[in-house]
Structures are given as C-alpha cells and as structure tokens.
Amino acid sequence: LSEKMDIAALSYMEQLGTRSDPSRDPSQRTVATAYLGLVPAQVKTTIPAYAQWVPVDNLPQMAYDHADIISEGVDRLRAKLSYTNIAFALAPPDFTMAELTHLYQAALGHEVSPTNLQRVLSRRGQLAPTGQRKAPGTKGGRPARRFRFTKQTLQVTDPFAILRPS
C-alpha cells in the first residue's frame, strides 16, 4: 500500500492474519497475509488516478475475500479504540477535543460525546493538555484547548472497556 498510494508515514501497523483457504482464489492456490496500517490524519498522500479513498461503509465490489479482510481490519480498529490508546496513530501530534472526537466518530461509525471521550481518555491517563489553544475562529467564543497523547506506542489502557453508541 505504501508503494501504490505514496504512504510512507504509517504510524502503526499490525498483522491481521493470514488467509490460505484453498477456495479464496478460483484460479490458483494463494496465501495472503493482511495488515492493519494506520496513517495519521494530517498526512497528505498522492493518490494515483486508478485509486481512491472510500468510506468503509460504502465499499465497491471487491475480488476474492478482500471485503472480508477490510471488515476484519475495521472491526479490529474499532475494538482497539475501546481498550487501547491506538488513536495516537490516527491523530496529529496535538489536537482539540473536537478534532479527536471527529476521528473517533469516523473510525467507530457512530456519534461520540466529546465530553465523555475527554473524561474517559483523561481518566485513563491518555491525554495531556499542551497549554496551547486553537486560534480563535470568526464566530468568537473561547478558543479550544489543545491536547496530545501521553504515549506514542500501543498500550492497553482498559482491558474491560467498550465504546459503543448510547
């Protein structure tokens, strides 16, 4: 993927699994090892004309078992967002809670309360304020505080947690 999509800045990668079902490719026996790779939101990529980013809930028709592999990756990410600090791999170095909430909502596929998200992540020791604030917008109001993740490596933060729609 990094060669085809000009993505050199993977912030996290793990093996999803190896598939070797004899019927996965009707023309020959193939073995495929799939990986979950995360790219930080702020990374800009050059996408070739033959490719495009698509929402995971609106995938095009795919060959073989590729849709199943993607579904497995999405499920793995969603689960890990509940009990680890894996969001560090999606977020920029510093962010507002609104920006982080947007990342969680996009990954989880449902609404997330910014207040509850901040409370949970702070209680787990995942967030630290940077002391900076976002530049004020045109609508006025208090500028949003900026945060960063305390760790940039994967850690289990709550082995019994689950984030789900209320």
What does each of the following model-derived ranges do?
Residues S2-T45, A79-A87, R124-R133:
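Active-site segment of metal-dependent pyrophosphate-handling enzymes
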Residues S23, P92-D94, G137-K139:
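A short beta-turn/loop motif at secondary-structure boundaries
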Residues R29, A63-Y64, E111, T115, ...:
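Non-catalytic, surface-exposed connector residues within folded enzymatic/regulatory domains
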Residues A34-G37, K44-L81, L90-A98, H102-L103, ...:
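NUDIX/MutT-family hydrolases
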Residues H102-E111:
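Short helix-coil junctions and helix-kink-helix linkers
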Residues H110-P136:
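Positively charged, solvent-exposed patches that mediate nucleic-acid binding
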Residues P129-S166:
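Long, intrinsically disordered, low-complexity Ser/Thr/Pro-rich regulatory/activation regions
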